[in-house]
Amino acid sequence: MAVGKNKGLSKGGKKGVKKKIVDPFTRKDWYDVKAPTMYTVRNIGKTFVNRTQGTKIASEGLKGRVFEVSQADLTNGEDAYRKFRLIAEEVQGRNVLTNFHGMDLTTDKLRSMVKKWQTLIEATVDVRTTDGYLLRMFCIGFTKKCANQLKKTCYAQHNQVRLIRKKMTEMMVVEVSSSNLKDVVNKLIPGSIGKDIEKSCQHIYPLHDVLIRKVKVLKKPKFELGKLLELHGEGTSKGGAASTAAVAKGEEGVKVDRPEGYEPPVLETV
């Protein structure tokens, strides 16, 4: 038997004792995620982040988070195949204020539209809104049978496809370049751009299922808190954006009564 000190006994504890497990959620705070005024449902969920510790500020950890929400949840409607991406841009108290960051169709919707015996037509365009957002828009559409057609297929000729694609591009540029971001989102929710394209292309070849398939935000203007608050319906007429909903619930200043001639005590160290 080896002679020497038993390290396990000298420490006064058993070898391999488990450390106390601390629940990581005790260090986190929950925040409400708010959607802009374009949507019917404003409170879209909750998110959490580690509390402020030292130089790590909680609100900075929230900015830039992207939330993907179904249109049905945002509008209390039935169009669940359209998904909107919202990005966190500002934190006011316990509220995370978001802005539009993109739109997409669900995979099952896209797959269900692609069928045999018809021509698929796609168009892409980069266009800038009046308030400085550069958007890349993708449009998709399908040919359909003419009235009283007996033939099984409904294929468009190459020159017809080119004309339809040109019309799609022109319509998207006209609709977006004359609108700000809020108006563009209001057009995307009911799918009005796709319906207008479908009507304008009827004389070239009958179309159906014409939709804006995807929208990407390529560039944004310089961030302005006042504009974001206007988008959330919190802008103020008096004193401008600075006095904003200056303060979210529970964070307003409290008036303290002081006797006349009161002077604060001088601190020895700062």
UniProtKB/Swiss-Prot annotation:
Keywords: Cytoplasm, Ribonucleoprotein, Ribosomal protein. It comes from the Eukaryota. GO terms for molecular function: structural constituent of ribosome. One of its GO terms (cellular component) is cytosol. Residues 235-270 are annotated as: Disordered. Its main location: cytoplasm. Component of the small ribosomal subunit. Mature ribosomes consist of a small (40S) and a large (60S) subunit. The 40S subunit contains about 33 different proteins and 1 molecule of RNA (18S). The 60S subunit contains about 49 different proteins and 3 molecules of RNA (28S, 5.8S and 5S). This is Small ribosomal subunit protein eS1. It comes from Ixodes scapularis.
